[in-house]
Structure formats: structure tokens, C-alpha cells
């Protein structure tokens, strides 16, 4: 049984007050995974630690991907959170605002990307700043309620996948220091719509993982992030796997990319 979701805002989310979409969760054969769509009221779902370990007293917010049209809620959400909780972290799965659609938003996205790619990209770019604002508010909320969650407000991390990685980057580059995480892990993230040429001073350490055969060509985004963070003198680590495709998350493919979360934990442990 999962914990009850925590709403990020007291009322309607700022900037989308008129949205009336109904959140849905269903299995899509197109992506072969469980997805959540039509999020208009963003929430955090706490996943408390299930054992003591290196993450004791630390929080990690997990942002699933899905092209800003859906959230891969298991492989890039709760499966990640459960793994982190098993080594002591207090994890939170973030449901951020998404493009509003009909009964099967994933099918609508796949069709639009086939027939009108520019329109699909425009839809994503339009909602991305709202999703980023939700990521910022999630960090603020966890810090504000740190005592309640038994976490250190100076040890709040953020892991995001694909579009969720874009959210993670927006949070990492926030102009509000109170909304910036203490460490960040954009996994096969897209940098679309974000100026990463000059990372803000005080940005926390970054962990990157991507597959060289990423079907969306996002390897170059991770390489650019690595180079930009290095040039700025910021701590960064990049794992570029030969195979894994896009969206590997916690899927078992019997490839080295399956172990990305172990490498993340190794990296985190070395932060001290």
C-alpha cells in the first residue's frame, strides 16, 4: 500500500488554473509499461526507507519520464524509489504537470510524433516550464517538512528520467537556491528548452547515465552536460553505456545499463 499523495499546492497549480483533465493510470502496450497521464494537480508520493543504509536521513525526489505526456510510473518511478528506500533514503515520486489529452494520451503522442513532430515538440516545450516549477516546489516542500520526514534539509537529491530529467535540470538550474537540490541525476535527459551553457554557481554534484544507442539521440545531451559542468568546475560523473536504448529505467535487459542505479549509489557514497 502506497502512502497518500501530498499535493504541492494548496489550490490549483499556478499557471494552469483552468485545467480540468482527469488523471489516469493504465498499462500501455505502446510503451510496454504502466503510465500516469493528464496530471493537472501535481503531487509527491512518499516512499519511506525500508532499511538502514547509506541514505539515512537523506531524501531523493524521483521524476519519471514520458515525453511530458505521461509518466512511466513504475520503471522510472516507484521501482527506483523502492530501490533507494531499501538503502535508507526517504524517496518521493513526483507526478508533475503534463500535456492534457484524452483517454489515451500516450497513443495520441505516438500518432502526433508520426504525423506532426513539430506540434508534439511544441506541446512538450509549452508544458515543460510548469513541470519544472513543480519540481522546484517539490524540493521546497521536502525541505520545509524535513523534520516530519526525518530528513536533513541540506541533503535533498533529485533523480529524473528523459522528460523527468529535463525537470531535474530545470530544478538544478533554478534561480531560487531554496529550490535547487543538493545533488542531481538526470538520466537520459533532454536539455531542450534549457540554457545549460553556464550552470549557476552553487549547483550541486551531477550524475549522468545514458545509452549510446538511445533511440531519441539524447546521448549528446548528456555529453554536453558533462562538458558544461566540467568547464564550470562543478562535480560531475557520466556513464555512457554502449547499449540500453532509451527509457531503460529499472528494466532488466541483461546489459551493463541495468546496473546504472548501483553506479549512482557508488557515486553518491563517494560524495561523503
Named regions from a protein language model:
Residues 1-53:
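N-terminal cap/lid segment of alpha/beta-hydrolase-fold proteins
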Residues 64-69, 212-213:
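Active-site glycine-rich loops that stabilize anionic/oxyanionic intermediates
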Residues 73-93, 227:
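Short amphipathic alpha-helix adjacent to the substrate-entry channel of hydrolases
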Residues 106-147, 260-263:
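Alpha/beta-hydrolase active-site loop
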Residues 107, 223-226, 230-272:
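C-terminal catalytic histidine-bearing segment of alpha/beta-hydrolase fold enzymes
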Amino acid at each position: 500500500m502506497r502512502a497518500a499523495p501530498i499535493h504541492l499546492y494548496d489550490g490549483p497549480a499556478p499557471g494552469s488554473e483552468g485545467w480540468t483533465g482527469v488523471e489516469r493510470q493504465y498499462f500501455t502496450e505502446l510503451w510496454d509499461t504502466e503510465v500516469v497521464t493528464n496530471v493537472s494537480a501535481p503531487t509527491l508520493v512518499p516512499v519511506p526507507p525500508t532499511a538502514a543504509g547509506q541514505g539515512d536521513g537523506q531524501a531523493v525526489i524521483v521524476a519519471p519520464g514520458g515525453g511530458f505526456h505521461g509518466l512511466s510510473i513504475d520503471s522510472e518511478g516507484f521501482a527506483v524509489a523502492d530501490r533507494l528506500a531499501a538503502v535508507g533514503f526517504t524517496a518521493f515520486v513526483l507526478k508533475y504537470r503534463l500535456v492534457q489529452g484524452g483517454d489515451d494520451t500516450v497513443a495520441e503522442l505516438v500518432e502526433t510524433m508520426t504525423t506532426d513532430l513539430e506540434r508534439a515538440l511544441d506541446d512538450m516545450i509549452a508544458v515543460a516550464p510548469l513541470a519544472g516549477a513543480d519540481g522546484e516546489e517539490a524540493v521546497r516542500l521536502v525541505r520545509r517538512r524535513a523534520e516530519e520526514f526525518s530528513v536533513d534539509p541540506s541533503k535533498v537529491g533529485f533523480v529524473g528520467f528523459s522528460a523527468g530529467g529535463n525537470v531535474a535540470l530545470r530544478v538544478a538550474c533554478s534561480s531560487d537556491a531554496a529550490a535547487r537540490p543538493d545533488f542531481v541525476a538526470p538520466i537520459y535527459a533532454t536539455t531542450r528548452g534549457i540554457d545549460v551553457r553556464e550552470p549557476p554557481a552553487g549547483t550541486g554534484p551531477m550524475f549522468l547515465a545514458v545509452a549510446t544507442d538511445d533511440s531519441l539521440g539524447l546521448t549528446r545531451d548528456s555529453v554536453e552536460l558533462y562538458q558544461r559542468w566540467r568547464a564550470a568546475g562543478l562535480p560531475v560523473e557520466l556513464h555512457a553505456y554502449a547499449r540500453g536504448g532509451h527509457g531503460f529505467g529499472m528494466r532488466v535487459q541483461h546489459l551493463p545499463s541495468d546496473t546504472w542505479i548501483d553506479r549512482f549509489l557508488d557515486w553518491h557514497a563517494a560524495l561523503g
